[in-house]
Amino acid sequence: MKDKKISKSIKMQVQKIPTGIEGFDDVCRGGLPAARSTLVSGTSGTGKTVFSLQYLHHGICNFDEPGIFITFEESPLDIIRNAASFGWDLQKLIDQNKLFILDASPDPDGQDVAGNFDLSGLIERISYAIRKYKAKRVAIDSITAVFQQYDAIYVVRREIFRLIARLKEIGVTTVMTTERVDDYGPIARYGVEEFVSDNVVLLRNVLEAEKRRRTLEVLKLRGTVHMKGEFPFTMGDDGIIVFALGAMRLTQRSSNIRISSGVKDLDEMCGGGYFQDSIILATGATGTGKTMLVSKFIEDAYNNKERAILFAYEESRAQLNRNATSWGIDFEKMENEGLLKIICAYPESTGLEDHLQIIKSQINEFKPKRLAIDSLSALARGVSLNAFRQFVIGVTGYSKQEEIAGFFTNTAEEFMGSHSITDSHISTITDTILLLQYVEIKGEMARAINVFKMRGSWHDKRIREYIITGQGPEIKDSFSNFEQIFSGAPHRVISDQSIPNVFKGIEKN
């Protein structure tokens, strides 16, 4: 008897179907509830139509589930043309009887509406198409257009409810779009659309620091769990990609294998080198040698016949090659041999989510063992702290997932003196932190390096001087005769030898 109750409760659980939209199914913990309706709401240009088309296209191509697309706005020809820009051949699917586009768009010549509004004819057409094509998925774009054509909102709501009820009765999973006036205002323009649907997904395209940032939020998923909050997404060549950072799991393996920094003395300071799956951050003022350490890191990968990829956001390819040559490193040779790939771009050329997707796709294509980003601080310009933090988490999480050693640089705002490396929460995400700084000693400028942090390993705690030579950095002894080096005001420590003998026996209070 107990087993029967358990079996019955399992059957009563809400079943989900995957949408095939990358990252979205993670946010929904498996996909959309089957045989239910989902309202996708957003302002103009947020990607509502793309979402509904991608849902149908992936359902047909990945899960062999035929679909029906009902358009109240655009003509079928326009929809087919727009979908082609994402590589989706809808005409081919139509010819294969796997997709049917039902045209309910208004007459371009206009029409006079007389009598009572009724969707009975349309409901029967949709029901017939579902039976004919054995459709499992339906998309309606958009129900806002229906409200715009008729004044009696309560009547339109009743008819939309009838349509959704019929689709649920048939057993298809429906996605319908609606337009809202403001990204953080009412869910839908007419204030009633959300009440006829089981689930609500909000798409936003918010202006932040003179840039548009797209986010997705699952507001409601009736009868089942989902991830809360806004998640960044981008629209690329393959459609919508959601960055579900909250779905990332700390399940990656941890390696004890060491790799070289490319600088022998720095390896000794790190207890034998970096761990091969670690994230290293070099932070310091401009000109302290951060890019040089990146170059040595890449050179060591080349010497070990390993692939490396460099994303440069502050210098051009020609400038990088010239600077590397001054340290005896030949980037052009590495690229010609297929062991190095350099990608240069202005941070302002696109949004952080697009930069993240480019990094992930390039890593997936090139399959490097080492990744370098020069610099993170350039990408932080003109974006919100939360957006930047999500970007860093996305990059580090993907690097660890792929078991890639990552070397990132960060330019400190202070030219001399102590500086914070925790403002953007970078320090807690990275495994190793190298502090580089200028110090003034006896009227001359010197450079100092310190291994500030290294997870899981002993490391040298001393602050050591280093100089830049034609072969890269040369690390010297520590500033043993000075203290408060990183404060910007170092002063000499008085040794016992400089104290007169008469005072040596006096104990300190």
UniProtKB/Swiss-Prot annotation:
ATP 2 binds at T286, G287, T288, G289, K290, T291, W327, R447, K453, M454, R455, S457, H459, K461. Its cofactor is Mg(2+). Signal peptide: none annotated. The keyword Nucleotide-binding applies. ATP 1 binds at G45, T46, G47, K48, T49, S85, K220, L221, R222, T224, H226, D237. Keywords: ATP-binding, Biological rhythms, Hydrolase, Kinase, Magnesium, Metal-binding, Nucleotide-binding, Phosphoprotein, Repeat, Serine/threonine-protein kinase, Transcription, Transcription regulation, Transferase. Mg(2+) 2 binds at T291, E314. Residues 1-243, 257-509 form the KaiC domain. GO terms for molecular function: ATP binding; ATP hydrolysis activity; DNA binding; magnesium ion binding; protein serine kinase activity; protein serine/threonine kinase activity; protein serine/threonine/tyrosine kinase activity. GO terms for biological process: circadian rhythm; regulation of circadian rhythm; regulation of DNA-templated transcription. Its EC number is 2.7.11.1, 3.6.4.-. Belongs to the KaiC family. Homohexamer; hexamerization is dependent on ATP-binding. Component of the KaiBC complex. KaiC interacts with SasA, activating its autokinase function and leading to RpaA activation. The kiaA gene has been eliminated from Prochlorococcus during genome streamlining. It has been suggested that the central oscillator in Prochlorococcus does not have to be as robust as in other cyanobacteria because the former live in specific niches of the Earth's oceans; they divide exactly once a day and at the same time. Thus gene loss, and changes in kaiC function compared to other cyanobacteria, can occur. This is Circadian clock oscillator protein KaiC. It comes from Prochlorococcus marinus subsp. pastoris (strain CCMP1986 / NIES-2087 / MED4). The lineage of its organism: Bacteria, Bacillati, Cyanobacteriota, Cyanophyceae, Synechococcales.
